[in-house]
C-alpha cells in the first residue's frame, strides 16, 4: 500500500509498499510466507484475512466517542460485530507532522500479542469520503475505564451517560489491588522491552482496565523502536510524552532507553498508592526541579510509613525513579520484586 505520508525512514519494512502489498492497509500480521512457513495466530472472533488486509468500512459501526485529544478521537465501535476501539488521527492539527508520526508510532505494536498490551486489529491511511482523518487504527476494546479514572474517581465516559459508575472493577484501590495492577503493567513493559519498544508515555490515563480486571497498556503514539534510534545520537524530532512522568534524562535531551518507562511506572505506582497528583505548580519550575534538584513526589505519606508493605513499596518506587537510568531496575527484576511483595502481603 503506497502511503501518502512522507515518513519512510521511520516505517517498519512490513508497512512499506511491496510487490505483494494488499490495498489500503497497514497489516497487523505478516503473511505466513514471511514468517519462515509459520502460520500467523488467528485474530479472536475476527475473520483471519482482516488481520492484515484493508479495513472493511461497511463493517465498522461507531457507537460512542470515548475521548478526544490533540491528534484525534477514540470511539467505541464494532467491527464485524466484535467490540473494538477505533482511533482516528485528524488531518487538521497544529502539527500535522507530529500527527503523522503519532499514527505510525501506534503501529509499532501492530504485530504483537500480549495480555497486557492493547492489540492492533487493522490500520489504514484510507478513510471514508468526507472524513477529516489521515489514518484509522482499529484496536481490541481494552475496557471501559482507565487506571486514571479508577484512581481519581472520574466518570468512565466523560461524554457518555452521567449515571454510569466510574469503575467497573468494583471497589477502591487497596494495596493488594495496587500490586496486582502493577504486576500487569510491568508484565506489559517486560514484553515491550523484549521487543525493543519503549512506550515513552506510560501513565494512568494510558492504562486500560478490562472487564476481567486486567490492566492493558495502550496509546503508543509516543513509542519508539530502539533499533530506529541507533543511527542517531539524538532523535530527529522532539519526543512526546507527559512531562510529569518523563524521565530526567529525556528532559535533558539524552538518549532513550527502556529505563525511561521504569521511571514513568514509578510515578504511576505512586499515584495508585497515594491517589494524589504527582506535582503542583508551574510546569517549567517542575521540569527544572526534577532535573536540577531531583524533585520527586513525596514518600512521606502514611501509606509508605505505617506498615511494612507500604515501606517496601516505597523502596520499590524510590529505586525506579532514581536520577540515573543505569541505577534503575529493568522490568524483569522489578517483576520479581513485585511478585514477591504480592505473595507476601497481597
Swiss-Prot record:
One Pfam family named in its UniProt record: Pkinase
GO molecular function, a single term: MAP kinase kinase kinase activity
Annotated EC: 2.7.11.1
InterPro entries noted in UniProt: Kinase-like_dom_sf (IPR011009), Prot_kinase_dom (IPR000719), Protein_kinase_ATP_BS (IPR017441), Ser/Thr_kinase_AS (IPR008271), Ser/Thr_Kinases-Pseudokinases (IPR051681)
Domain Protein kinase: start-end pairs: 60-341
Keywords: ATP-binding, Kinase, Nucleotide-binding, Proto-oncogene, Serine/threonine-protein kinase, Transferase
Annotated positions binding ATP: 66-74, 87
Catalysis performed (reactions): L-seryl-[protein] + ATP = O-phospho-L-seryl-[protein] + ADP + H(+); L-threonyl-[protein] + ATP = O-phospho-L-threonyl-[protein] + ADP + H(+)
Catalytic site positions: 201 (proton acceptor)
PROSITE patterns: PROTEIN_KINASE_ATP, PROTEIN_KINASE_DOM, PROTEIN_KINASE_ST
GO biological process, one term: negative regulation of metaphase/anaphase transition of meiotic cell cycle
Annotated signal sequence range: none
Protein family membership: Belongs to the protein kinase superfamily. Ser/Thr protein kinase family.
Record-given protein name: Proto-oncogene serine/threonine-protein kinase mos
Species this protein is from: Chlorocebus aethiops
